[in-house]
Every structure is written in structure tokens, then in C-alpha cells.
């Protein structure tokens, strides 16, 4: 729990009841479970586990939690679905690395996509453009000349 701020704790304190759309029932998630999952997610991010292809179910298993809980916690805390959460982490990581590692600027788009865990160049390009406003090749050409 070392990386969790008081704001996150307070925010998740309000997450006791989450609606399960498929059964139209209420799932109760205790504060302890929420904080535990958030701590494990923070650890996952710090260890850059998002750089490998990963699914909601495989991450839930790795974090020793329920996929529905994990999905709801990500949806509520990050205000995005699981795929967007993972892909955004990947793009943020790449943008940071491009600032410090000039060798990455020489990679092909396909190689960059695979290096940060994307299975397809198309998904990488779409996410990259959504995040930066530029397609990857334009962005790389721009930073190469700086």
C-alpha cells in the first residue's frame, strides 16, 4: 500500500457496491479488497507488466483477484476499460522512453508496437494517435529532427 495516496483511499472508500450488469445484482467489494487490488495494480505498473501481452483474466489471476472486481476497479478508478488502461500505460511508457533512448527512434513502427506489448501495428497506431494526436511515423520524424 506504499504507493497509494490518501485521495485514492478516500475515492475507493465509496466503492462498496458495484452493479453487476449481467445478473442485475449488487456486488459488494470491501475497502480492504479494493485497496489490495489497487496496491497490486501499482506494483504491476511499477514492474512494467503491461509491456507483455496480457488479458483481463490473466492479470486478475496474477493479482489473485476476481476479473469482475478488477474490471470494475479499473473502470471506476481510471474511468476507462481494461484495454484502454493497458494500452495507455504502454503509450505513456513509450513516450517517456523515446525522450531518453535515442536508439528507439530508429525502430520500425511494427517493432515499437511489439516491444511495448501490442499484438498489432494497427492497434498501436490507433492508440498512439489517440494519445498524442499524431500517427507514430509523424511523431518519430518530428522528434528525430529535434
Model-derived regions: residue spans:
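Hydrophobic, helix-length membrane anchors
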Residues: 1-21
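Cytosolic nucleotide-binding catalytic cores of signal-transduction proteins
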Residues: 19-146
